[in-house]
Amino acid sequence: DRSSAASDVYKRQVLGDEQTSEYFPILKGKRIAIFSNHTGMVGDKHLLDILLENKFNVVAIFSPEHGFRGDADAGEHVSSSVDKKTGVPILSLYDGKDKKPSEASMRKFDILVIDIQDVGLRFYTYYITMCRLMDACAEYNRKVLLLDRPNPNGHYVDGPILDMKYKSGVGWLPIPIVHGMTLGELALMVNGERWLPASRVCDLTVIPCKNYTHQTKYTLPIPPSPN
């Protein structure tokens, strides 16, 4: 009925990374890598800091275009380093074959945690990096845990589907320009449709948002790219 639908609108959305009781047990005793950047905030703290405070063994960070703290320019080569605040090593996403992490990097961890804000556009590069990491995790038998976030453009779908002969670093899947999905939904679709190279399937767990529908308005608390 209309009144309960209206009240749902006012329920606060609970993001995947806020649901620590759902995913802390999954991470116990594991060597953890995270794929995140400056948008991976749980309230006013970064996911990395929360995991370290709770004595989890975070061994590596993968960071996308713009760098882990979000301060590099688009397309600028972000070299491997360490996160100055925590000392956790930042590994290159591209030091292996096919623009994927190297085998040495993949052997460092047991589970990859993804927490990053996407905007639901085909040419936005974060989902492409996610797919490459899913592919590497499938190849090396690593688990993936995705902490989902709302899509600020999740209320509509628009534009043609990519002709895969034009697959590139700014368009990687046969999806419309505005695809309407959260990263978690997209990751599940990638697995379900066997879109990874060689039809690989990744061992994937998604912690979905609570109180989120595709009609729910979501205002980004932090700009997803610095430019």
Ranges and model annotations:
Residues 79-109, 121:
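Glycine-rich oxoanion-binding loops at beta->alpha junctions
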Residues 167-227:
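Conserved anion/nucleotide-ligand pocket segment
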Residues 118-130:
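Glycine/threonine-rich flexible loop motifs
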Residues 1-10:
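Single conserved hydrophobic/aromatic residue that forms the stacking wall/gate
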Residues 56, 139-143:
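A short helix->loop->beta-strand "cap" motif at the edges of active sites that frequently abuts
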Residues 59-67, 147:
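Short internal beta-strands
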Residues 70-75, 145-167:
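Glycine-rich, charge-decorated loop segments at or immediately adjacent to ligand/cofactor-binding or catalytic sites
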Residues 12-56:
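N-terminal phosphate-binding or glycine-rich loops at protein starts, especially the Walker A/P-loop
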